[in-house]
């Protein structure tokens, strides 16, 4: 995205020197941002400012409205893995000045584009894949089912087509999620429950789960539910409750068991230790008792959906 702008300035507010830029008023902040980037302030240049981990600076959140009002020529994207937890800290985003969007894993169409199959992507999106291209399309879909859609994993796979080389990508992601427990767990018990989820919860992907004693643990439904909802606010997973009615409005039954969907099939494959089964499967629909196919369908349902409140349903 940055390549589409004349000027691209990335900031990461986990770095103290970047976070300190927002300790001043909007004019001083903008001036220092450009000085740090060693770029002149030029209103004629299309400029993108990318602020990562914005949850680390309430001041940066507050200044977003002034970028909108006083510096409309600077396009601002703010990202963070824990944005919804800011609401619990009574840190509010400027009303009417910020558009909320969720960032999803790459879709199959994105995977095709990244791996040099852009023309085939058009055929797939237009539902016009003919018999001659069917086998190649299914082979690529099998690769996508194995790799998943995490951007770094897709980019690395596009370079070398080596699934083993992706292990450090998945490892790093899983380790970072585990390390982030300290940021969003309120109590020691919640830390332990979340660690259990991040260690053992992947094998329950797409299953209807019972919260009490989940994953053969001794944790109560209240403790497990609180931990799951905390991870849900980070978009790492989603609890999807069933719909039982035949008529509109379709309302989820929260008294019934929810299904657990994780962020990405590639992470599930790695964390649940089923990569080998996926790699040598002749039929994705049968792989892992059909659970992988359901995870992939759930992901594709979200592709292209950027509304932060979008959720999936299932019917029983």
Please give the residue ranges for each predicted region.
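Interdomain motor-coupling "hinge/lid" segment immediately C-terminal to the ATP-binding subdomain
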Residues: 88-204
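Accessory nucleic acid-recognition modules appended to NTPase machines
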Residues: 158-316
């Amino acid at each position: 995205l940055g390549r589409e702008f004349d000027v691209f300035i990335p900031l990461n507010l986990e770095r103290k020197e970047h976070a300190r830029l927002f300790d001043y008023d909007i004019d001083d902040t903008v001036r220092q941002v450009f000085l740090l980037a060693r770029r002149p302030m030029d209103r004629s240049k299309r400029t993108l400012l990318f602020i990562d981990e914005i949850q680390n600076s309430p001041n940066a959140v507050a200044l977003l409205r002034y970028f909108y009002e006083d510096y409309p020529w600077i396009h601002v994207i703010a990202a963070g893995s824990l944005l919804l937890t800011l609401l619990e800290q009574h840190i509010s985003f400027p009303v009417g000045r910020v558009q909320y969007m969720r960032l999803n894993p790459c879709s199959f169409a994105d995977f095709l584009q990244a791996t040099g199959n852009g023309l085939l992507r058009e055929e797939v999106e237009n539902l016009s894949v003919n018999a001659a291209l069917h086998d190649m399309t299914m082979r690529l879909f099998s690769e996508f089912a194995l790799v998943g859609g995490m951007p770094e994993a897709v980019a690395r796979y596009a370079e070398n087509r080596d699934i083993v080389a992706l292990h450090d990508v998945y490892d790093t992601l899983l380790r970072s999620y585990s390390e982030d427990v300290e940021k969003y767990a309120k109590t020691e018990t919640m830390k332990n429950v979340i660690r259990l989820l991040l260690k053992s919860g992947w094998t329950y992907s797409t299953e209807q789960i019972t919260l009490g004693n989940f994953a053969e643990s001794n944790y109560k439904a209240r403790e497990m539910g609180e931990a799951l909802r905390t991870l849900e606010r980070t978009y790492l997973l989603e609890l999807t409750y069933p719909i039982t009615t035949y008529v509109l409005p379709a309302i989820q039954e929260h008294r019934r068991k929810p299904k657990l969907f994780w962020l990405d099939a590639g992470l599930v494959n790695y964390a649940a230790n089923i990569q080998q089964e996926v790699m040598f499967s002749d039929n994705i629909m049968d792989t892992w008792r059909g659970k992988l196919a359901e995870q992939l369908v759930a992901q594709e349902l979200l592709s292209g959906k950027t509304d932060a409140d979008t959720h999936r349903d299932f019917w029983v």
